[in-house]
Amino acid sequence: MQPIPIVAIVALVVAIIIAIVVWSIVIIEYRKILRQRKIDRLIDRLIERAEDSGNESEGEISALVEMGVEMGHHAPWDVDDL
């Protein structure tokens, strides 16, 4: 084969691999955003119910615990994951 078609095929394969990697990252980030929205909605419902009734709903707290969300101190300046 001539060198130009070989280079074109290699470039096409590399472009496809890069596209797969980029779209994989996009899908992962999109899932994170959806999960965070769900967590935010649950927290908002908890706050709303706590204001209405004076206590928190156990069902929604257990849903947050199942998702791995820690309740408590939420200080953005207090980062311990370094």
UniProtKB/Swiss-Prot annotation:
Keywords: AIDS, Apoptosis, Host membrane, Host-virus interaction, Inhibition of host innate immune response by virus, Inhibition of host tetherin by virus, Ion channel, Ion transport, Membrane, Phosphoprotein, Transmembrane, Transmembrane helix, Transport, Viral immunoevasion. Enhances virion budding by targeting host CD4 and Tetherin/BST2 to proteasome degradation. Degradation of CD4 prevents any unwanted premature interactions between viral Env and its host receptor CD4 in the endoplasmic reticulum. Degradation of antiretroviral protein Tetherin/BST2 is important for virion budding, as BST2 tethers new viral particles to the host cell membrane. Mechanistically, Vpu bridges either CD4 or BST2 to BTRC, a substrate recognition subunit of the Skp1/Cullin/F-box protein E3 ubiquitin ligase, induces their ubiquitination and subsequent proteasomal degradation. Pfam families: Vpu (PF00558). One of its GO terms (cellular component) is membrane. Ion channel activity is inhibited by hexamethylene amiloride in vitro. It comes from the Viruses. HIV-1 lineages are divided in three main groups, M (for Major), O (for Outlier), and N (for New, or Non-M, Non-O). The vast majority of strains found worldwide belong to the group M. Group O seems to be endemic to and largely confined to Cameroon and neighboring countries in West Central Africa, where these viruses represent a small minority of HIV-1 strains. The group N is represented by a limited number of isolates from Cameroonian persons. The group M is further subdivided in 9 clades or subtypes (A to D, F to H, J and K). The N-terminus and transmembrane domains are required for self-oligomerization and proper virion budding, whereas the cytoplasmic domain is required for CD4 degradation. The cytoplasmic domain is composed of 2 amphipathic alpha helix that form a U-shape. Phosphorylated by host CK2. This phosphorylation is necessary for interaction with human BTRC and degradation of CD4. Residues 29-82 are cytoplasmic. It comes from Human immunodeficiency virus type 1 group M subtype B (isolate HXB2) (HIV-1). Homopentamer. Interacts with host CD4 and BRTC; these interactions induce proteasomal degradation of CD4. Interacts (via transmembrane region) with host BST2 (via transmembrane region); this interaction leads to the degradation of host BST2. Interacts with host FBXW11. Interacts with host AP1M1; this interaction plays a role in the mistrafficking and subsequent degradation of host BST2. Interacts with host RANBP2; this interaction allows Vpu to down-regulate host BLM sumoylation. GO terms for biological process: receptor catabolic process; symbiont-mediated suppression of host innate immune response; symbiont-mediated suppression of host type I interferon-mediated signaling pathway; symbiont-mediated-mediated suppression of host tetherin activity; viral release from host cell. It is a single-pass type I membrane protein. It is found in: Host membrane. One of its GO terms (molecular function) is monoatomic cation channel activity. The modification Phosphoserine is found at S53, S57. Belongs to the HIV-1 VPU protein family. The chain crosses the membrane at residues 8-28. This is Protein Vpu. Residues 1-7 are extracellular. Disulfide bonds: none annotated. Its main location: host cell.
